[in-house]
Amino acid sequence: AIMNNLKVKSSAAYRNYSMDAVEIHDAGGPYAAKGFFYRDMKMDSLVPSDIVAWDESGISDKVLDSFEKTVQYCKKNNIELVCVTSPITPTTSVNGYSEQAGAYFTRLCEEYGVEYYDFNLLTMDTLPRTDDDFFDEEGHMLGELADRYSDILASVLLDKCDKSTAFYGTYAQ
């Protein structure tokens, strides 16, 4: 372990803050850039996660203050701010917590005049997906789904899709 640490820390990649210097054994796929691991391995089952029940009171004033400052900065500098919730596994998204979180962020963004999209509400026709398209219950997508989602995200943000048919109106649908 010591020799490996010396080898890594003396490399040009490490000195230049490159991810190439980091060995990550449990990422599920190669590092693709900008914090993205292209996970392509199918798992026998999802990596379990400790899913925490949604609790609005757990959002600190500091976080809300940071959000407000971000909104103010964007408005002052004529920057369009769009907030999104990326999709998680279908099984996890229907447990009620996603719906509660989505309702909270919908209200918060409406209060500040910020556009918000909950991509858990994408129809299955728009983005076909199953739990098998994810690495874990938290919503880390396998690469193929991440590619498809990125295309849909871009089409929504660029206003190139019919949002009235791309999204379900409620989680019950």
Where are these regions (language model features)?
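Active-site segments of SGNH/GDSL-like serine hydrolases
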Residues: 70-96
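Short amphipathic alpha-helical segments, especially helix-boundary/capping motifs
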Residues: 43-47, 79-82, 125-130
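Secreted/periplasmic serine-hydrolase-like ester/acetyl group-modifying domain
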Residues: 1-76, 165-173
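Long, well-ordered mid-to-C-terminal structural blocks that present hydrophobic/aromatic surfaces
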Residues: 63, 81-90, 105-106, 159
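Acidic-and-aromatic substrate-binding clefts and catalytic sites of carbohydrate-active enzymes
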Residues: 57-63, 90-99
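Short, local alpha-helical segments
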Residues: 51-54, 86-92, 131-136
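C-terminal regions of proteins
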Residues: 95-173
